[in-house]
Amino acid sequence: MKEKNKMIKKDSPAASEAACRNVVNEFMVERARRAQSFAMEKPHYHPYYELYFLISGSCRMFIDHTIYYLSAGDIVMLAPYQLHQTLYGSGQPAERFTANFVPVYIEYFASQCSEDGLASIFSKRKLSVPKEQQNYVKELFLQMSKETLSSDCYSRIQLKSFLFQLLTFLGRCRGPEQPDQALDPDDAVIQNAAQYIYTHHSEPLTLEAVAKTVHMSPAWFSRKFHRAVGLGFKEYLTHVRLEDAAELLLTTSLSVTEIALTCGFSNGNYFGDAFKKARGISPREFRFSGHVQAEDNR
């Protein structure tokens, strides 16, 4: 494959087409209006970063184990494989921008501003952009959107430029943290349950035990949890355990079986099947690919 690419002249139509395809695969910007009737079928996650900017209206977003209420001017930063779901409220339709991009863009940004600089941007998932600066953020999303539709070899350069301007703005925009809007009672109960699961996922949790922590019957809790999160109790617990396992695969020398047991799975075979279903590769393949990528980035 590499030899074939070497034979393409840099100024040839084939090279331009290849560059354009790569940009489309690496970076996508979407602007959409969402009515109350729109709803994600269930929470999802993806192997790339996402910046979500709410232009108008309001919505409710569940991320990992926390519920956020968003209003116009709020921006949310999502890292790869963060579970999330958006629900839109009553009233006027909401309008939002999303920018999705592969980790290589973030890795390059971090190499220029330090890991601490990057961490400060993603340390709090939601940021309220001051009203007088919302048009600036909107314009950056518009410019990125235009570049994803461009067919020349400069698109990637421009995309990096606009994205890095946006990330720099977000990093500098972080002043004293403002308290989040208080959750309504039902959402507060579900968030408490999700956070309990997140904290205790390595233990042999049961639906009955978690329902007891929020003072609900198992049947009622199961219905409320699924309605609010979009996943059943067992599905959500498995997702949390798999994300912990993925981190341990890349950061420890524990065996696959040891990791499975550490994260709360009853046996290695079930863990392997669940991991492959979620990630598309086995735990061992994931560990190997992660280590190879780390070596390539040195």
State the predicted function of each range.
Residues F122-Q134, T148-S161, L167-T199, E203, ...:
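Short, Lys/Arg-enriched, Trp-marked, Pro/Gly-tolerant hinge/linker segments that flank
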